[in-house]
Amino acid sequence: MNESLVELSAYLKNKLGDKLEETILAFGELTIVSRLDAITGVLMFVRDDSRCQFINLTDISGVDYPSRDKRFDVSYQLLAPRHNLRLRIKVRTDENTPVASACSIYPGAEWYEREAYDMYGILFSGHPDLRRILTDYGFEGHPLRKDFPVTGFVECRYDNEAKRVIYEPVVLRQEMRNFDFLSPWEGAQYVLPCNEKAEGEK
């Protein structure tokens, strides 16, 4: 384990104390879990404190745990070039409780937060322009949530006659296949189009 991360973990526990829910040192990485109402204070501290100096926000991502009451983790990936250290800060929230925006602390957070909103529906209070960034206008749902259907709700295509993009309900050309992933020898329970002859010889 990197000795610098062990020292940093102890330092953050000492300085941030009640603002943190837990600290995790695993696989050579330090993760701290912040209370939802303390996230801006924690981010400002790790940016401005001379022992930390995590001045670069490299990513904000979401993770969906549908079985939890606070189903979303918002994960901030930070870099301190001066100390050559990385830090992950997590905060937990639900579908209706917004996380305070980090845009005033890290200006680069704006597009990362828009992506988390678009993909997961995570809300950020105080964001200057919280709207979709990757999906199309009028898109329904949030595609990286675990309860979002794999096939989606609609499909879009260019209609040559109408000379525009149109949206239609998803039509599956074939049923979902049933694969037996537990057996290395057993395949699908039906005959594939190219195997009729082989099946007839049995």
Swiss-Prot record:
GO molecular function: NADH dehydrogenase (ubiquinone) activity; NADH:ubiquinone reductase (non-electrogenic) activity; quinone binding
One cellular component term from this protein's GO annotations in UniProt: plasma membrane
Subcellular locations according to the entry: Cell inner membrane
Membrane topology per record: Peripheral membrane protein
Main location: membrane
Keyword Transmembrane belongs to the record: no
The EC number(s) this enzyme carries: 7.1.1.-
Functional description taken from the UniProt entry: NDH-1 shuttles electrons from NADH, via FMN and iron-sulfur (Fe-S) centers, to quinones in the respiratory chain. The immediate electron acceptor for the enzyme in this species is believed to be ubiquinone. Couples the redox reaction to proton translocation (for every two electrons transferred, four hydrogen ions are translocated across the cytoplasmic membrane), and thus conserves the redox energy in a proton gradient.
Full protein name: NADH-quinone oxidoreductase subunit C
Organism expressing this protein natively: Bartonella quintana (strain Toulouse)
Source organism phylogeny: Bacteria, Pseudomonadati, Pseudomonadota, Alphaproteobacteria, Hyphomicrobiales
Gene it is expressed from: nuoC
